[in-house]
Design a protein with these regions (language model features):
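Intrinsically disordered, low-complexity linkers and terminal regions
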Residues: 1-148
Length: 148
C-alpha cells in the first residue's frame, strides 16, 4: 500500500523520516539540512498539520531555498511567531485529515540517498526544491480549509 499523502510505496516514508532524524541528530554533516528535511516532509504530509501550519512550513521552504535564509536567521526572525504562548495559530492537526488534496509527488523522502553526508545534503536539497515547486502551485484557502 502506498502512502496516501506522498505516494511512497508501502508507507515507508515515516520510517525513513525517523531514520533520517536520528542520522541528522548524531552527525553534523547530515544535520546541516535538518531544516529542509522537516519542512519538506511536513509539506508532503499535511494531515500532521493545520492549514496554517502547512502554509507556514511551505513558506519556510521558500525562505530557505529561494531567499537563501539560514536556519539561524529564520530562528531570530520567527522567535515570537512560533512561541506557543504568543502564536495565533496551531501547527499540529487535531483531526489527522490532510489539508491538501495532493497524493502524488515527483520526489519523496525515499528518493534521498544516505551513503555519505555530501550526497545526503544534495538529495535532501533536491527533494526540498521539488516539494516547494509542486507545493507553490497549491492555493490553500485557510478560512475554508480548501485547496484549489
Amino acid at each position: 500500500m502506498s502512502c496516501p499523502e506522498c505516494g511512497a510505496p508501502e508507507n515507508l516514508c515515516q520510517t525513513r523520516f525517523d531514520e533520517f532524524l536520528v542520522l541528522e541528530f548524531t552527525d553534523a554533516g547530515y544535520g546541516a539540512v535538518h531544516h529542509l528535511t522537516v519542512a519538506a516532509y511536513m509539506v508532503q504530509h499535511s494531515s500532521k498539520m493545520t492549514p496554517e501550519g502547512w502554509k507556514y512550513e511551505r513558506d519556510l521552504l521558500r525562505e530557505f531555498l529561494v531567499e537563501k535564509k539560514t536556519p539561524a536567521t529564520i530562528r531570530k526572525q520567527i522567535k515570537d511567531t512560533v512561541d506557543s504562548g504568543k502564536r495565533t495559530f496551531k501547527f499540529k492537526s487535531k483531526t489527522g485529515v490532510p489539508v491538501i488534496d495532493k497524493t502524488k509527488w515527483k520526489r519523496t523522502i525515499l528518493n534521498v540517498r544516505a551513503e555519505n553526508a555530501k550526497v545526503y545534503r544534495e538529495d535532501i536539497t533536491a527533494w526540498a526544491r521539488s516539494v516547494l515547486e509542486e507545493a507553490s502551485e497549491i492555493i490553500l484557502d485557510i478560512n475554508n480549509n480548501e485547496t484549489k
